């Protein structure tokens, strides 16, 4: 039986923490769908199309990873793509409470969907897209936290000029 997993998120922008989890998940599952969310309650820095394009560029070397944009319920997306695993990253204990509630809701909406929680590597445990954008907005060095392609896109989008 082939197992398809979905790794959902806003990915605004995709960080080294995200790509680490995607690479690790790609070794665990036959197919990993990186599902980039359009969330009307958030004001992303990058448009959905820009986030999908960045992710496609960064993940093209991983054969069993597919990048899509989506809106709507994750449980429905999983059903539409015959995915039975939902990958979620947990950076700290504080993330677990929300993720636990989300896993239970998704299982209620789609009983065939199981959540798998992955912890980041130690070097990525504190990285978040929000922090990366905040540092970049102040011309800080984010090269340790994102791919050079993302750093260039952030510099262009935010009008920053940091370079190493």
From Swiss-Prot:
It is found in: Cytoplasm. It is an enzyme of class 2 (transferase). This is Phosphopantetheine adenylyltransferase. SUPFAM superfamilies: Nucleotidylyl transferase. Reversibly transfers an adenylyl group from ATP to 4'-phosphopantetheine, yielding dephospho-CoA (dPCoA) and pyrophosphate. ATP binds at residues 10-11, 18, 89-91, 99, 124-130. Its EC number is 2.7.7.3. Transmembrane segments: none annotated. The lineage of its organism: Bacteria, Pseudomonadati, Pseudomonadota, Gammaproteobacteria, Alteromonadales. GO terms for biological process: coenzyme A biosynthetic process. The keyword Endoplasmic reticulum does not apply. It comes from Pseudoalteromonas translucida (strain TAC 125). Belongs to the bacterial CoaD family.
């Amino acid at each position: 039986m082939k197992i398809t997993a979905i790794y959902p998120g806003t990915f605004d922008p995709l960080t080294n923490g995200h790509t680490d989890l995607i690479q690790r998940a790609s070794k665990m599952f036959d197919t990993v769908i990186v599902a980039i969310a359009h969330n009307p309650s958030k004001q992303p820095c990058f448009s959905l199309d820009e986030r999908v394009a960045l992710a496609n560029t960064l993940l093209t070397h991983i054969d069993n990873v597919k990048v899509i944009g989506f809106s709507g319920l994750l449980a429905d997306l999983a059903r539409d793509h015959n995915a039975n695993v939902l990958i979620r990253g947990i950076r700290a204990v504080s993330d677990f409470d929300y993720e636990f509630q989300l896993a239970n809701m998704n299982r209620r909406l789609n009983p065939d969907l199981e959540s798998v929680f992955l912890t980041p590597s130690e070097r990525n445990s504190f990285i978040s897209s929000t922090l990366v954008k905040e540092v970049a907005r102040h011309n800080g060095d984010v090269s340790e936290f994102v791919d050079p392609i993302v750093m260039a896109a952030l510099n262009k989008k935010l009008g920053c000029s940091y370079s190493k």
